[in-house]
């Protein structure tokens, strides 16, 4: 499992997956080429079969009556008309995968006549009149022309055999139907063209020249209605005699109109007529029939399909079915698009399996049982998509899958949070087992590193209870979702597996209660394909506009500096809220519960909307939330509060995000904890680092406070990730520091500043190793960076007088001898001083910058506005009303109301001639506890009353305002209402946290009071001894004694041993006794011979040190030389510090314990041991600076 945690191994797995996808595509292309060759061979066979049938019908056909024989000049179409007929004969079989029910023998004879008329006589045995322009064509020539004809012609001739029966197509085609019934024309006629474009009927077979634009669609729809069980079974019976009668009398109807056309070139007029009348050609828009001709055409079609009533009824049935089909299809598209837009990034659930004999038989049985044997098999939402349909979509999505894998590889090669996976591994109870089912003829993606052995005998049962639609969904528990192509069943072998199995078991029971047709469809669900979301749609989900953005529009008045600041601040706040609200949708790692809901609903969206799918989606959502909420969290202190906020509205999400930003700007640790618990940011150091660098609304000062806190390991990891995101290559030291300080304000306590500068210097050394080689010690970079910060503060601080500021010579003199006694090159120091003098080192603008600009434009301001948590919301021009029942002049009481997130500041404009300030301060009212209501009377149409409690009393301050228009008042009220709700909820959270802190303090004080009893009153009692031991153990556990900052001392104390009646110890020169068993190994562990009678001491006893002693790491030869000196120094130190070691209770036999409680020393900040710490290769660089400021040998 540890190999999974390696970033290169993860990248290799992604590359293997990408290779498998490429091989998949190559195999699919090879399969398509084979099927194209198969189609061409079938076309040749069908043309030969049609020709033999035509000859057979010509032999059986009686000689037509003399009056109905067409004149010798009657043209016949070109011999190439056979190809569309053959192609269309293949299309109903292979493109649609269905057969039309067989009809009696008269339609068979009619079909023979229909095929016989447009084709010339290939043999001399058939005695039919021919025109001088026509020549007999051999079957081989026709077959050659079929091969030369492009494949795009098959769609244009798709309706030549629409009304032909299967019996006329030969028995050879019927025997091959189960093998190729789902084959699509991949390159000549896609499924969309076959589904949406009605084909033209054979114009060349009818001498009347009328187009079958409506007739073709009518014929297709009649066939569909017959296959669907509609009450139109009389249509073939009525249609066949009419068509047979019309074909036996070809010149009776169309001779009046077709006569002038035949006077021209007979080989070109009929194709031209077909082009003019067919609506699928561009010529249809250039030539339109007159109203009389259209009416006559409709009348002829009605007569052709059995009369007016029969054709009207059939047309109504067809139109109703088609409209219902279009509505359901559009609704399915809309639902799929909405679900796809909510899916997280980098998720591509792709399940493809090659068709087997069982799947084809099941599909055929489904079609026969549902009565859908005659419908064109398009991509209808009620039918399961087949493998042939997935070929085209796999080709379209291949580029998206490659891009998704590229992003996954980039994420794996970047700084990866190993601690999440480590906690997942150490918990031991969360193991996911993947059972990859081999697919027929298609290589599945096998991820060896993700496989683990079954943890129990119940894994197989649980795997069987999981449906296939949720196999990729449970992968969200790994926080790293890749493209899944092969079918997978994942069983959860953890404590939550029982709840998952129960939820999904209920779903399975619900699925078994559905009808047989639905069971068959679900049984064939392995061939279904979940729709994939393009990366472009996933990157930018739609986010509603913020309320603050709506309130950005202000009333038209003279522009001022503060108003421009307000507009800029409001626009920035709108961007912050949109980023915060949309971040939970973008960050797939944070809102796994929401994503599980979307994935389960999207997997069920390919089926029809039924109650079973809704129940399954709800059950899967609960099961997945149970799995993911039980996973160990990295930084979430309370896992019960880390639930996905999927039920909250968009307004509540934005409010919670702003509350999280306010908490961060007040207390960074609490703010990060709140944002992680609400799912806005991931609980990994790299996720928090990206949040601090990219999101707006965070105070630069508080970012520095958070990153400079070296007491928490999580903060140190985040700082490492932050500096790793910055590139300082080929940059001067001051310019790199300027880039670093643009994101993080380096100020505050010296320890935090030192921590930030140390991390910066380490990163700069990594990016510029050639610069570091110029110095004798890499610590020179740290010293020089610190000197630049001091120079910038000295040069631009307003508290330092100009005559006392640091000059260039002072700066050079202060840096003398810092490079291990050597001076830094003068030109380097001069360049740094000049660049700092030209431009100040300062952070980028944040929300506090706008508040500061407003504060500087106000005169008489007593309240401090510039606070890290204060944010400007909007500014409105209102008019203060002293008495709501009296009319007053509005111009005399004009007020500029600035609404902050926790404060309402009321100002009035200053005269420009009298003062350089813009505003004069009037009032500042807090929003906590504020109530407001709108009023309207005969004097003021748009009024508002604000009531705020006064501090220290029960009275309330009441203010009345009115606005000129309703729009401005409405926007102000909306912002005010949201700000009051925000500050109220923030206060509730603060009170809850304060109560928790006080309860924790009371618990600790009670424990300490019980442990630190009166030592004089309980000096010799056993209870005092037990309490002293308990207090000592608690101190050890709370102090976190480490080998890096505490010295492991020995159990030797001569003075205490004599006082307590212990045996006399050996002389001071003798080595001390051995250490008690300690779980932490010490590098300086010595093994001298033990004393004869050592006193019994508790195993965790330590001697408190009064100063921090560095641990010196030596190699074996040096350790052998230093061993006598170290033992002598330790023994001397033990004898000299025995008085100060009395704080540790060492008990002798039969003597009372003298307990002197002293607080333990606080541990110093640990050394900066980053994985990418720069270690120079030179032999001269033998010293390194640690975070505590001291140096030690390496």
Swiss-Prot record:
GO MF terms held by the record: guanyl-nucleotide exchange factor activity
Keyword Phosphoprotein found: yes
Compositional bias of kind Low complexity: 79-92, 561-572, 600-610
Protein name: IQ motif and SEC7 domain-containing protein 3
Compositional bias (Basic and acidic residues): 1024-1035
Tissue: Expressed in brain. Localized to dendrites, as well as somas of neuronal cells.
Location of Phosphoserine modifications: 255
Keyword Heme included in the entry's annotation: no
InterPro entries: IQSEC_PH, PH-like_dom_sf, Sec7_C_sf, Sec7_dom, Sec7_dom_sf
Coiled coil: 20-56
Organism: Rattus norvegicus (Rat)
Name of the coding gene: Iqsec3
